[in-house]
């Protein structure tokens, strides 16, 4: 990952978006930005959760539960917010926490499906990504920033 320092002599290679690993990293990062934008625009108190179901071409099909109404006005505001986040090139920070701490975080953020899933996780550490005050878990690498 690009935020890590090289500690010994080695060969560094870059993974472009045209390769599968690069595309997946880009997509995860874009989803993270989308989720943050939705919660920023609609308000955390108005969104219970967002579920990304699958992709259709270059688009994502998702559902949103809560009192916020998913309409064209909200979509337009989310798009503007995503562009603001991208333009600011905000670091996407990764931290390793205990699985128990991750479970507590998921509960605090009303991510009950992840909370339940992680109760069965055997690994003691989990990587949590944060974008300003927004946190989530993703399986795989992320871009170093929103730009």
Show which residues each predicted segment covers.
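Short, hydrophobic beta-strand segments
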Residues: 13-18, 58-69
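Secondary-structure transition/capping motifs at alpha-helix termini
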Residues: 40-46, 87-88
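Loop/turn positions that initiate beta-strands
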Residues: 7-12
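Short acidic beta-strand-loop surface patches of small beta-rich interaction domains
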Residues: 1-3
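Divalent metal-coordination and catalytic microenvironments
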Residues: 32, 62, 140
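Non-catalytic interaction/regulatory segments
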Residues: 56, 65-147
């Amino acid at each position: 990952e690009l935020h890590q320092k090289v500690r010994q002599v080695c060969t560094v290679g870059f993974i472009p978006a045209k390769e599968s690993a690069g595309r997946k990293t880009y997509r995860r990062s874009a989803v993270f930005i989308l989720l943050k934008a939705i919660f920023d625009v609609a308000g955390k108190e108005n969104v219970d959760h967002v579920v990304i179901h699958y992709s259709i071409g270059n688009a994502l099909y998702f559902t949103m539960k809560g009192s916020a109404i998913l309409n064209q006005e909200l979509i337009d505001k989310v798009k503007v917010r995503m562009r603001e986040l991208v333009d600011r090139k905000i670091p996407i920070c990764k931290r390793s926490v205990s699985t128990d701490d991750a479970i507590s975080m998921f509960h605090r953020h009303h991510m009950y499906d992840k909370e339940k899933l992680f109760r069965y996780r055997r690994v003691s550490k989990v990587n949590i990504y944060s974008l300003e005050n927004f946190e989530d878990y993703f399986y795989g690498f992320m871009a170093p920033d929103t730009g």
